[in-house]
Amino acid sequence: MMDALEKYVDSLSTPESELLRALDHETHMQTIQPRMLSGHIQGKLLEMFVRMLRPRSILEIGTFTGYSALSMAAGLGEGATLDTIEVDDELEELAQRFFDRSPCGGKIRLHIGSALDIAPTLG
């Protein structure tokens, strides 16, 4: 049932970008828990929420490989930023590489470490 529903929703959604498709593929190839990836439908939902709410800043705790951060950044307006915190330093290179390739990547600031330590330092 869920596969049919997911296929239906996917058929009505905007197609996944080449960049996000490549990130999905690399996440599945390079991580031991690729199911943690937000994915296309969840990413589009996050982007829609951001477009509707028009925040000036977003704090994401748990970057993983950056799919949700890229999705939310796509919905951010001019001058808005997204700070994303990831505790696993082994994921930094993969996430940052895709942030650097994205036209929205300049809106994203990746922080590596404990959210308990980093969040209070963010303005």
Question: Language-model segments: which ranges?
Answer:
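Short, flexible coil/linker segments at or flanking structured domains
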Residues: 8-11, 25-26, 34, 46, ...
